[in-house]
Structures are given as structure tokens and as C-alpha cells.
């Protein structure tokens, strides 16, 4: 079997040090520049993915709060289609 020291996980931890927070706890801090950039990129990507979903939910919530005749008709038709589809498949 190979030695544990050869695994990429063990080698990659060499880039991590700790920093003290205000409450005295220590948290890991990435010192490697590429790792920090990667984390920033992932955070930005996640924000771009989550934002449209939040907008859709917000619009749905607004339409429920003050429905217009058109939005009510759309909701009823969608429900009816789903119900009909379910009836045909079961």
C-alpha cells in the first residue's frame, strides 16, 4: 500500500493555516492564491445561479398577494392541466 503522505489531500493541506477570530476560535485560512480565487469564483457562480430562482419566487409571491384576473386564469389553467395529466397517467 502507498504512504498516506503521497495523497493529494495531505499535500494540499500544506497551504492552509489558521487565523483567530474575535471570539478566540481558530478557523482555517487559505493562503494559496489560486485556492482563494477558486473559492471566490465558486461563490460568484452560486450567487448567479441562486438569484434568478429568488426572483421567480418573489414574482410568484407577489402574484399571490395581489392576483390579477390574468394571473388567476393562468394559475387555474396550470392546475387543471396538471390535474388532467395526473388523471390520464393513473
Curated annotation (Swiss-Prot):
Primary site of residence: host cell
Subcellular location: Host mitochondrion inner membrane; Host nucleus; Host cytoplasm, Host cytosol
Compositionally skewed regions (Basic and acidic residues) per UniProt: 19-34
Entry keyword annotation includes Glycoprotein: no
GO biological process, one term: symbiont-mediated suppression of host cytoplasmic pattern recognition receptor signaling pathway via inhibition of MAVS activity
Superkingdom of this protein's organism: Viruses
Note: Is not encoded in all strains, and seems to be dispensable for replication. South Carolina isolate has been sequenced from formalid fixed-lung tissues of a 21-year-old male which died in 1918 at Ft. Jackson, SC. Brevig Mission isolate has been sequenced from lung tissues of an Inuit woman buried in the permafrost in a gravesite near Brevig Mission, Alaska. This sample was recovered by John Hultin, retired pathologist.
Family recorded in the similarity comment: Belongs to the influenza viruses PB1-F2 family.
Protein name: Protein PB1-F2
Amino acid at each position: 500500500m502507498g504512504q498516506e503522505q503521497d495523497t493529494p489531500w495531505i499535500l494540499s493541506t500544506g497551504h492552509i493555516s489558521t487565523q483567530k477570530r474575535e471570539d478566540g476560535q481558530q478557523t482555517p485560512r487559505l493562503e494559496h492564491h489560486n485556492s482563494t480565487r477558486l473559492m471566490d469564483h465558486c461563490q460568484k457562480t452560486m450567487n448567479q445561479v441562486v438569484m434568478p430562482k429568488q426572483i421567480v419566487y418573489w414574482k410568484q409571491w407577489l402574484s399571490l398577494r395581489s392576483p390579477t384576473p390574468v394571473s388567476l386564469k393562468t394559475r387555474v389553467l396550470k392546475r387543471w392541466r396538471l390535474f388532467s395529466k395526473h388523471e390520464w397517467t393513473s
